[in-house]
Amino acid sequence: MCASCLHNANAASFLMETFSRHRLNFICIGKMNIFYNVTSLDNKYSFHNPSAPVPHSSHALSSRQAHFTSFRAPVAPPSRPRRSQLPSSAKLLYCFDSSFSTEKRELMLFSMNFISSQTCVTFEENCSIPNRVQLVNGKGCSSYIGMNNIVQHLTFNDTCIDFGTAVHELMHALGVIHTHSRLDRDNFLNINLTNVSKEMMHNYAIFNQSTNVVPYEYGSTMHYYANISTMFPKKSEYSATLGIGRVTFYDMVILNTAYNCKCPNELLCGNGGYTNPSKCSECICPLGYGGVLCDRPSLIGKDTGLPLEVKDKIIEVKVVGIDNFFSYPTCLINGLEIKYMGDPRITNPIYCSADLINGKSFRSKLNPLLMNIHTLFGKNKVTFHYRYVTERLSGYNKTTNGYDNYEYYD
């Protein structure tokens, strides 16, 4: 069967009054378990004018993209602590500096509320306690890692006004390191330190005292952008996924594990979800799943319909073509993610270049199969063929991610 999906997502028209990172629309395509998920990103914090021509030159970068090419360079002093130090409790004290604009305050408060809605971590404004984070307008976007019993600066200038970057720096203050500083990072990245300047070298240091609690997540908001001369994923299909700034399911798992966030009674959440420690009556679901127990696709919108069950079948998708996708060093502007991997929680490769995905086929270990599109603005079109094959999912072995007990088809 063939399907063509067309979506006009001018985020400015319906999201300018919010700081929401995404808005979800699931549309049932055809008569199989395929769901098309449009994520319209909020361009209140994007540095892009939807009505202006989008540059195609790799040198014509927006402020935020230029910031990615410098890898969100921390500018803390050379004595910046390298060991992750968790705050003594799940409460982070902060104070807004007088230099911090109203817009940045609103974004930071929204980002804090997002983290609190997914974890047991809370934030309290307190400008008198020494052990606090002082949010200041300064050079670049940076934060110490963990708390150090001092008034420490979280620097957030005008190139940082973005939800993913705000969460990134707050997670640093909460003790979370960069993904590419994990002990096992060399299993997933090729890094050429000869091309890294001395002042940037600390950004590539491995934390020997760190503890991994989730699989390596190329899509994490804690991961820097890929650069062929310095850092590139060993799974090359992830080259445009690194650094897009999307806050992932596993990002919040890190915080919940680090702070031992739990509910008195655990719900039986489906599809890899888990009980929300901030609201114990519901589950936190991987992107694309909904319901109180994450037991169904998250259908939002009119006339979405219901899928025809094709139980125990592998679904195959072939992308015929993508149109009006803008390919930059990352899929920051827009991207297509086909959830074909067995773990519904992990970020799959995200594509925004027709040269890399047109004609490419995927066989999914998930049924139903989810397809995610995120976009800042514009009209994106995806045309694909899909079918189910005679091979059965139950013929595959089940495995776990090595960090928890949830099983999925390998």
Curated annotation (Swiss-Prot):
Disulfide bonds join C120-C261, C141-C160, C263-C283, C285-C294. Zn(2+) binds at H168, H172, H178. GO terms for biological process: molting cycle, collagen and cuticulin-based cuticle; proteolysis. It is an enzyme of class 3 (hydrolase). It is found in: Secreted. Its cofactor is Zn(2+). Glycans are attached at N37, N126, N157, N192, N195, N208, N227, N397. It catalyses: Hydrolysis of peptide bonds in substrates containing five or more amino acids, preferentially with Ala in P1', and Pro in P2'. PROSITE patterns: ASTACIN (PS51864), EGF_1 (PS00022), EGF_2 (PS01186), ZINC_PROTEASE (PS00142). Metalloprotease. PANTHER family: DISCOIDIN, CUB, EGF, LAMININ , AND ZINC METALLOPROTEASE DOMAIN CONTAINING, ZINC METALLOPROTEINASE NAS-16-RELATED. This is Zinc metalloproteinase nas-18. The lineage of its organism: Eukaryota, Metazoa, Ecdysozoa, Nematoda, Chromadorea.
